[in-house]
Regions:
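Metallocofactor- and cofactor-centric catalytic cores in central/energy metabolism, strongly enriched
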Residues: 1-204
């Protein structure tokens, strides 16, 4: 079993990153490495979509792929691999011959570049969680979706700090916009949330 590297949550080993065969959260190295491969496939998809129009299928795969890789969401290696295969097929149908991006390049980049690209990547993953829940309720925002592709493409490009910093700021702005979208989706679907008493008894 290959070793892993993962440092996207605040509970990483020694506050530097989980290595070896199992993370602090229990994620196995094979799953962590498959999630890196999935991320590389998403970058390939983003590049392919840059030369074509995005579609409902590519949007769904982008959201599912990013959501699948956030902390403690999916530790099923078979599911992660299946999703990678679907993303690869979508990208191949759009732009044959494009290779998946090797995410190790991000982890091995100079510290400042690694930090900025990580902020973008982890921000996109978190935003995708909001966007996917809004998507499930039938709410989609074109500006948000377009930024997922833009952000993932930039991760696969050679960029300096001056070019990455504005994207980090934009990631934050898009995240707020997505939170507004999810709030709208929830309130229009379920009504305004109100304080409600609930029983605290333990039931079988």
């Amino acid at each position: 079993m290959e070793e892993m590297f993962c440092f996207q949550c605040q509970q990483t080993a020694h506050n530097t990153g989980c290595e070896g065969h199992t993370g602090v959260c229990g994620k196995k190295s094979d799953t962590a490495n498959l999630q890196d491969e999935l991320t590389g496939e998403l970058i390939r998809l983003a590049r392919a979509v840059a030369e074509n129009e995005r579609s409902r299928s590519s949007d769904e795969l982008m959201l599912k792929g990013l959501f699948t890789t956030i902390t403690n969401v999916n530790f099923n290696s078979d599911t992660v691999k299946k999703l990678s295969d679907e993303i690869r097929e979508e990208a191949e149908n759009r732009k044959p011959g494009k290779d998946a991006y090797n995410v190790q390049k991000i982890w091995e980049a100079p510290e400042d570049i690694r930090s900025l690209k990580s902020l973008i990547l982890f921000g996109l993953r978190g935003t995708a969680a909001y966007a996917y829940h809004a998507w499930a309720l039938g709410y989609v925002d074109a500006e948000i979706m377009n930024f997922f592709y833009k952000g993932m493409r930039i991760l696969g490009e050679e960029k300096g700090m001056e070019e990455l910093l504005p994207v980090v700021i934009e990631t934050g702005k898009i995240n707020l916009r997505c939170m507004e979208l999810l709030d709208k989706a929830n309130t229009e679907s379920y009504g305004d949330p109100i304080p409600t008493e609930v029983p605290l008894t333990i039931e079988k």
